[in-house]
Every structure is written in C-alpha cells, then in structure tokens.
Amino acid sequence: MIGSHDLRGLRERLPMSGSAGGRWLLLLALSAAATAVLADPAPEAVDPCATFNSDVRHERALFAGQAQPLAAAKAAAGAPAVTPEHLYQLQLHQRAEVTFAAPPAQRHPPPAAGYAGLVTLEVNAAGLYRVALNQALWIDVVAKGVSIQSSDFEGRRGCAAPHKIVEFMLPANTPLTLQFSGGITPTLTLAVTRAPAAAAPH
C-alpha cells in the first residue's frame, strides 16, 4: 500500500524545475500514486463463525437447516427427548418455574429472570459428544442425579450458528438430562453431535 511518506519521497525524487514540463510530470506522478492509494482494497471482514479453534463444519451445517420446534420441560419427569444429529428450537421457561435434576454447576447462579428448561438424551455409543447452542446460557448434563464434568467448551462472539459448543464424555445407553439455565431469550437452538475423531482424547 502506498502511504503519505511514499508520496513525499516521490515528490523529492522528481525534478523540481520551474518549467511547465517538470511541474506537469510531478502532477502526473502524484495523481497516479493517489489513485493507487484509493484503489487499494480494504481488508475483508472475518466471519466470527469461521474462527473456532476446533472443526465445527458439521455443527454449522446443522444450524443452517430447519430446526424442529420442541417445548422444554420444567422438571426432569416427562422431559422430551432429543436425538443426536438433529436441530431443535426449544421453548424455555422462566427460571423460577423450573426444577433442575441437579443444581446447576456454574459458579454464579443464573438470574431469576433468565430462562431455563430440561430435555433428555440417550446415546448408543459411549464417547465424546458436543452440545451446540445459539446463545451463551449454561448447560449441565446430568446422569443419575450427578452432573457430568464438561471436557471442553468454545464460543464465538458475533456468531449464533452456533454461538457456543460444550463437549462431554457420555456413557452409552444411560438416560441423561440436559438442563439449561441463564438463557437471555425464551427460545434456544440446540444440536447434539458426535465429536470428530481428532477431537476425542487418545
């Protein structure tokens, strides 16, 4: 890119005679340099959804599809089931109306005015799974009344498709409760996926 110091250097290198020809050459050179400055393309904006450290192409493809509406439950009993590799749009409830299967594990409790809800999940094969969300709420995966510690998480400001991905090592053929808390809107887009082999611990 040509800057102002380049223009000054160009002016110094050209002959500065008082003749009309010298002045004309100087004007032509400066005009060409200024045109080059104006024509220099601006840097392209970076898509925040493309800046995840891990490979999230599969989750992004799911979030580009049509979400299935589903009402989350206010308690674990009778909570609807979600299936891996499907996209859901959950309808959440006021936090005060929800009874959790286990106390949310976050350090600071969600505000009473936030949104919350529960669904169930069961996977056929044990391994590392991802829970992808379109907002920065808190998620717990509960098995037999105990929260499963997350293995990793990642989020990107400015990206909602997905905004946040949390990874958990899940047991096979075990009823699990996914509980959400601290939502800022009453709807939550959600997908559960199997983590790529490269992401799984060796």
Question: What is the predicted function of each stretch?
Answer:
Residues 4-25:
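Bacterial N-terminal signal peptides that target proteins for export
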Residues 129, 169-182:
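Noncatalytic modules at the cell exterior or secretory-pathway interfaces
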Residues 160-171:
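Beta-sandwich interaction modules
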Residues 184-195:
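Edge beta-strands of jelly-roll/beta-sandwich modules across compartments, strongly enriched
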Residues 123-130:
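Extended extracellular/luminal ectodomain segments enriched in beta-structured repeat modules
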Residues 136-150:
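Short, surface-exposed beta-strand/strand-loop-strand elements in extracellular ectodomains
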Residues 42-113, 199-202:
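Non-catalytic extracellular/lumenal accessory regions of secreted precursors
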